């Protein structure tokens, strides 16, 4: 069995890739599933809830940012690091999120991205 360095290490946004890569991929996958089911354009609101360690360390470890970027269609190993801050500023200041960069929904982070401390 051969193991490459790419199997051991994943490229992603930080400061904690363990709290960003998975959530970013999962958020993008969710939006992609909406698109595949023909529901992306009909989506009017999106609520996200984080639990466990993602909730406990989320903001400090960048999980919130990763979820927003994933829903917007970005991938952890493909996003230009120089575009992260402007993309997040755009989402947060306009309080809108373009799912997969295609369909815009109202997204007020304090209402629509919740950190659940207890399950």
List PLM regions with ranges.
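Fe-S-dependent hydro-lyases/dehydratases of central metabolism
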Residues: 1-119
């Amino acid at each position: 069995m051969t193991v490459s360095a790419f199997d051991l290490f994943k490229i992603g946004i930080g400061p904690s890739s363990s709290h960003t890569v998975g959530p970013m991929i999962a958020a993008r996958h969710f939006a992609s599933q909406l698109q595949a089911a023909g529901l992306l354009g009909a989506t009017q609101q999106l609520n996200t809830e984080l639990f466990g360690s993602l909730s406990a360390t989320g903001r400090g470890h960048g999980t919130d940012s990763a979820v927003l970027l994933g829903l917007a269609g970005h991938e952890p190993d493909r996003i230009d690091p120089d575009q992260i801050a402007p993309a997040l500023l755009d989402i947060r200041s306009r309080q809108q999120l373009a799912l997969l960069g295609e369909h815009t929904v109202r997204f007020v982070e304090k209402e629509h991205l919740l950190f659940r401390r207890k399950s």
